[in-house]
Amino acid sequence: MLTFLHTADIHLDPPFSSLSPQQASKRREQLRATFQSMIQYIRDEQIPLALISGDLFDSPTPQMDTLRFAFSAMEAAQNCRFFISPGNHDYGSKVWDAFPLPQNVTVFRGGQLSFRTCRIGEHEVTVWGWGFETESLSKDPLSGFGGVDTRRINLLCAHCTLDKPDSPYAPISKKELQAAGFDYAALGHVHNADHMKKLGNTYYAYAGCLEGRSFDEIGKKGAYLIRLEKEGDQNNSLSFHAKRIRFT
């Protein structure tokens, strides 16, 4: 059985401009602590795979010490593979080229759908994704996609909007998502945690944000812990379980 974590919209290093400088600094440290708690959970539970579906950072130019903190934390979880799909906040090269990425971190670049295949334990896993290069991505990254190789476990890690064709934030349709044939679509951009849903043979959800940053971000926060088992090349043989995990 493959176990992995799905998180998104962490927004490290926000300005918190409505707060005093001292209060803003304290809230930024609290966000870091929540992220660090998630990393410690990954280490303690020996989770081998984590999908970060965009907006790990709040801007395309976070502070250098914030970059060092985040990359060092992920590197310390050396037995976990991290896949990141940059979103409309942490787009472009200034974030992802500032330091050499840890060996266990993969970042999807460019607005085109691409993939990486890796072995996680006994499982051959293909992770698909794209990355924002500017603050908008009006093209549908799933347009024209022919579908996955069902002999492997296929996961989509994506910052996007669903069934909003005029959205400037990587609009994809439910019809395309179902036709693509992913086993699980780990979505980001919507800050309210979504209930786990299913389209055809594809499970999907928005992870929501790791921690609320203002009074309009209430409700369930955290990440999804996913366990799935796939036998053979038939998607209907998929065993799937999802659990909500809080880190605050």
Explain the meaning of each model-derived region.
Residues 215-248:
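C-terminal functional module detector
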Residues 43, 153, 234-235:
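Intrinsic-disorder/low-complexity regions
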